[in-house]
Amino acid sequence: MITEREYHPVLVKAQSFSDLTNHDTPDDGRYITGVVRIPQVSTQELVHDTYRYVIIHGCRSSLRGGHYCAYVEVLDTHPIHGMDINSIHDWVREYVPVHGCLSFADDLDVEDGDKPIAYCIGWDYQSSRYRDSFMNNIENNIMDDICGATEWLEMVAKRQQFTCPTCDQHTDKIHT
């Protein structure tokens, strides 16, 4: 079960692992859903009480390794809401314990106006060690979809196009 004390990103529902292991094939619409924790920052102290929903797409290889993209919900009550993109990138790199690099795009202009701002995050796994750790995390944390995630995930999954800022090989239509 997900607990309040968990800190590392936790993936909770898998539809397909194939896109994560076959980096030479463009994303074909299959995805893995789950949640990721983004800790809040109050002065220098971390308050680990914020879960956010995420969609991870297996994509083509980037020059730096296997590449994944994710949408993360950022509520307006969270400290990073509305921050400069570069500041967010630096903050996440320092405080969020994930393997690989993180890059933020501008908010994705979510169509439903009452939904929180969403950011696109790219994971660049640079070695088999990171990839294996990532897959192990997925395989050991598969759970039923959590309450409240489905509607948001379905809304984001309907988006037809976006440009991934972290991989030059992508085009606007890689992710469908």
Name each model-derived stretch:
Residues 1-35:
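Charged, compositionally biased non-catalytic regions
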Residues 30-91:
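Amphipathic, interaction-prone secondary-structure segments
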Residues 41-46, 51, 79-161:
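Polybasic, proline/glycine-rich intrinsically disordered low-complexity segments
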Residues 163, 176:
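The −1 position to Zn-ligating cysteines in a subset of zinc-ribbon hairpins
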Residues 168:
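Cys/His-coordinated zinc-binding microdomains
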Residues 171-172:
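Cys/His-rich microdomains that often coordinate metals
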